[in-house]
Design a protein with these regions (language model features):
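N-terminal secretory signal peptides and thylakoid transit peptides that target proteins
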Residues: 2-22
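C-terminal segment of N-terminal export signals and the immediately downstream linker at the start
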Residues: 4, 26-48, 61, 137-148
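Active-site- and interface-proximal helix/loop "cap" or "latch" segments in soluble metabolic
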Residues: 40-137
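N-terminal Rossmann-like FAD-binding beta1-loop-alpha1 element of flavoenzymes
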Residues: 153-177
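Conserved N-terminal/central alpha/beta ligand/cofactor-binding core
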Residues: 184-298, 347, 425, 432, ...
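A glycine-rich dinucleotide-binding beta-alpha-beta segment and adjacent secondary-structure elements
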Residues: 307, 522, 533-618
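Glycine-rich loop(s) and the adjacent beta-strand/alpha-helix scaffold that form part
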Residues: 326, 331-400, 624-630, 636
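An anion/pyrophosphate-binding glycine-rich loop and adjacent beta-alpha core
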Residues: 373-375, 382-529
């Protein structure tokens, strides 16, 4: 994902009097609006404030007249350029025009929006205004006239699966309308992923030595790994069609290369099937927009599907709402559900995963709230009985934290690395619950299930370990304890090379201030901080294992055993995060939604992570498999829908 430092001053200036018309408001998807009552008196001048966004601190300079905020200048930030540009081009002008700090965030840039709004509100306070009143000022949305569309195919969601389905059907001459909650394609998860797993592609054949990987080999591995839980015929078909899905991506301009993943997987080197996408996010956005336009696909952004139009057991269309409340009716000959699972719905998390602690790995609030799954079940479809999630592999998170670990960057709070560095981990009672090395070696597969079942969990370390990570890092520290980075030994080790947690001391202090990290002079005091009743006994037993060099309880590799004896001691409260959820609608190998008697709902297809017949818990040990199945299923469903429409 491309990043840039802002060395020049990105300047946005406007006045409430001159205004920007309704352009800024319309860009936010708000339609016609009336401003809530707003009046203020300020000390004229310029004021600066800073707040943390998604990847960096954002500093703004605000200029005030006696009666209004007249300008906002971005002094510095290092957010994702294509996302932050929407905050600059849409949100800031709307704030200035309407003199309101309570506007909705840009849906694709929630954290960046929040940082800008918080910083501007701080400047309001410096200028003598009422910060809370400023943040409370909102816009009253007025819905537009009802809209009706008549199309061949309606696709719900424009993420990985929905995008693939849309362009695949559109290129075959079908009239496609796609509904997307986000304000642009930049806001969907599918555009940000590292790459798909696929077999027999031109990318694999083009590399030196070609490829020895075949469909049957991968099929047997994933079916045995999952104990034959997914739909076998669908899985085999996805793997067979994976090359065509990847060729579609290459065809729109994706530059891919086969690459080994950071942790050991069953397929790498001459059998590798992970396709790393080399295009920067900004370029991907351009490629997606062009591909949709070239395929003749119409996308309604800031639009949420609300229900299916059914004629008995046959799908006939979709109802939806725009962000301004406008009602939309889409009459369609077929419908593809690709709304991305339920990560953004805490109630469905609790229902299916038995936790409310699963956070969005990308930060902010996920737009994937289970809409497609609920619509399909309302129409008579049934769900599978396997539920899970695609875990974030970069560290713990916490809803209290301003900088949780969420991307392959070491600019987040380093203390969250203690959620998966192989050090001692305990549950809410202070008891061990896992072989800690699994979370370091295989954070997305073998290590993932127990952390969601035991959330929140706690990383326990002492000062000696903190000092070692601050000066040596995990790579040198673990090699000194006997690990080797040979294949089949400490495979992931090279990933940690030169990744030293040099800012750890200040990050620990930040965690203490935010309330998700505790520091104490004794283990007993540390236990009291989070109510970890059994922690003293656990540490005593764990230290015995460290002395023996053998974990007699869970078999953790000895190079991960780090004795806890040098105070002060630290506990990091961790919550899991995910890229997506698993568990959804049962389908056949044609992606048709099935009823309880296994007969299909005609014209209704379910793809991506809304589909419950392709995924498993814990997540696959094959990198890129979630994204691969998303694009595979989107490709297959589109072709099935095109044939059905005929």
């Amino acid at each position: 994902m491309a990043k840039r430092d802002i060395s020049r001053r990105d300047f946005l200036k406007g006045t409430a009097a001159a205004g920007l018309g309704l352009a800024a408001s319309s860009a936010l998807g708000l339609g016609g609006m009336a401003l809530a009552e707003a009046a203020a008196t300020y000390k004229p001048g310029k004021y600066q404030a800073t707040a943390y966004g998604n990847l960096s601190y954002v500093t703004v300079e605000c200029e005030f007249s006696e009666t209004a905020l007249t300008g906002v200048e971005i002094i510095s930030q290092n957010e994702t350029p294509v996302l932050f540009s929407q905050v600059q081009d849409q949100l800031i002008p709307a704030i200035i025009e309407n003199q309101a700090g309570g506007l909705d965030a840009i849906t694709s840039a929630t954290n960046s929006s929040r940082a800008v709004k918080e910083a501007i509100a701080d400047c309001v306070a410096q200028a003598g205004g009422d910060k809370e009143a400023w943040l409370a000022r909102t816009l009253t949305v007025e819905a537009g006239a009802d809209e009706t569309y008549d199309v061949d195919l309606c696709v719900i969601g424009c993420g990985a699966a929905g995008f693939m389905a849309s362009i695949t059907a559109g290129k075959q001459g079908k009239k496609v309308l796609t509904l997307e909650k986000a304000g642009s394609v930049a806001g969907v998860n599918g555009i940000k992923v590292s790459g798909p797993f696929a077999v027999d592609t031109s990318v694999l054949h083009a590399r030196e030595g070609g490829t020895t990987l075949n469909v049957d080999e991968v099929f047997q591995h994933v079916m045995n790994y999952t104990h034959w839980t997914p739909n076998p015929a669908l899985m085999h078909r996805c793997l067979e069609e994976s090359k065509n899905a990847v060729e579609n991506l290459v065809g729109i301009g994706y530059d891919m290369m086969e690459a080994n993943f950071r942790f050991e997987t069953p397929f790498f080197e001459e059998k590798g099937g992970f396709h790393l996408i080399k295009n920067a996010l900004d370029e991907r956005v351009e490629l997606w927009n062009k591909a949709l336009a070239d395929a003749g696909v119409q996308v309604l952004f800031n639009t949420t599907a609300t229900g299916l139009i059914m004629d008995g057991d046959t799908a006939k269309g979709v109802t939806a709402k725009k962000a301004d409340g406008t009602s939309v009716t889409v009459n369609a000959k077929a419908v593809i559900i690709a709304s991305g699972g339920y990560l953004g719905n805490r109630d469905l998390q609790e229902k299916f995963l038995k936790t409310r602690k699963l956070n969005a790995a990308a930060g902010g609030n996920s737009l994937c709230t289970g809409d497609g799954i609920l619509m399909a079940t309302d129409a008579g479809a049934v769900m599978t009985k396997t539920f899970g999630y695609c875990p974030c592999e970069y560290g713990g998170t916490n809803s209290k934290a301003s900088r949780p670990a969420k991307q392959d960057k070491y600019d987040q709070n380093y203390a969250f690395k203690f959620g998966l560095y192989g050090n001692l981990l305990v549950d809410a009672e202070g008891k061990r619950f896992i072989n800690e090395g699994l979370l370091c070696d295989y954070p997305m597969s073998y290590g993932s299930e127990q952390i969601v079942l035991n959330a929140p969990w706690y990383g326990i370390v002492d000062q000696a370990y903190v000092d070692a990570m601050t000066t040596q890092g995990l790579y040198e520290y673990t090699l000194a304890k006997g690990a080797t980075t040979d294949k089949g030994v400490w495979f992931i080790g090279n990933y940690f090379k030169d990744r030293i947690l040099d800012k750890l001391p200040e990050d620990i202090e930040e965690g203490i201030r935010e309330g998700w990290l505790a520091k104490a002079d004794t283990i007993e005091e540390l236990a009291e901080a989070f109510g970890l009743t059994d922690l003293p006994e656990t540490v005593a037993k764990y230290n015995e294992y460290c002395d023996k060099g053998v974990d007699e309880e869970f078999g953790t590799n000895p190079w991960y055993l780090s004795k806890i004896e040098t105070g002060p001691f630290y506990a990091v409260q961790c919550e899991p995060s995910a890229w997506s959820t698993f568990g959804g609608i049962r389908t056949d190998d044609r992606l048709r939604a099935l009823k309880a008697d296994n007969t299909p709902l005609l014209g209704l297809y379910v793809v991506g992570t809304d589909n419950g017949s392709m995924y498993y818990s814990p997540y696959y040990d094959v990198p890129g498999f979630c994204y691969g199945l998303c694009v595979d299923s989107g490709y297959i469903a589109a072709n099935e829908a095109v044939e059905y429409i005929k």
